[in-house]
Amino acid sequence: MGRGKVQLKRIENKINRQVTFSKRRSGLLKKAHEISVLCDAEVALIIFSTKGKLYEFATDSCMDKILERYERYSYAEKVLVSTESEIQGNWCHEYRKLKAKVETIQKCQKHLMGEDLESLNLKELQQLEQQLESSLKHIRSRKNQLMHESISELQRKERSLQEENKALQKELVEKQKAHTQQAQWEQTHPQTSSSSSSMQREAPPTTNISNRPAAAGERTEEAAGQAQARVGLPPWMVSHISG
């Protein structure tokens, strides 16, 4: 028959308990030695019996070295866990603080909008009223400042436009004055202006006089000149000229 499963509980029989302790202790020490050799691991095993007797095993008999290493690791682990716990606690604390602050701000915002005023007493309502009046005062002050700045800017632009308008008017007056002076000069010097203009308009004739026949007007003028020349001459000379 196979061996039955041992129930894991305290052995009440003192002798059986002592025998089991001796067997299990030897097996445990043997397993510690095997894992140390096979796996090249540092193993430290400490066992105290019911009577307080110490049984131990350490790789290369370096119990102190292993315990010191264990203490360093344990301390670092505790510090890390403590730091993480502290950080986690700080984050939770900060979250609660921020959440409360946000709720307070939202509540104040509703009060400023005239909502949820039923929960406020007389003193709180008076404080809210003073806060609103102070806010309105700052708002009006800022509004007036912006209005004054806007008016000053418009006045500056107005002055600039007026100066430009004056400059244009001055230029126009000077042009009108120059035009009037030119017209007056032309009125006081008509011959000079007309002769200069006619000289510009007319070109000198290029036709040969000796080759063209005399016009009727020219022959008439020539005959009149001859008749005038005959006046006062003696009759014999006139007949001689006519012949």
From Swiss-Prot:
Subcellular location, record wording: Nucleus
MF (Gene Ontology): DNA-binding transcription factor activity, RNA polymerase II-specific; protein dimerization activity; RNA polymerase II cis-regulatory region sequence-specific DNA binding
Phenotype of null mutants: Confers vernalization requirement for flowering in cv. Bd21. Lower expression of VRN3. Reduced freezing tolerance upon vernalization treatment associated with a constitutively expression of cold-responsive genes (e.g. CBF2, CBF3, CBF5, CBF6 and DREB2A).
Species: Brachypodium distachyon (Purple false brome)
MADS-box domain: residues covered: 1-61
Any Pfam family hit: SRF-TF
Record-annotated disulphide pairs: none
Region (Disordered): 173-243
Lineage of origin: Eukaryota, Viridiplantae, Streptophyta, Embryophyta, Tracheophyta
Biological processes annotated in GO: cold acclimation; negative regulation of vernalization response; positive regulation of transcription by RNA polymerase II; positive regulation of vernalization response; regulation of photoperiodism, flowering; regulation of transcription by RNA polymerase II; vernalization response
Protein name per its UniProtKB record: Protein VERNALIZATION 1
This protein's GO CC annotations: nucleus
Induction: Accumulates during vernalization in cv. Bd29-1, but expression is independent of vernalization in cv. Bd21. Repressed epigenetically (H3K27me3 hallmarks) by RVR1 before vernalization and in the fall season.
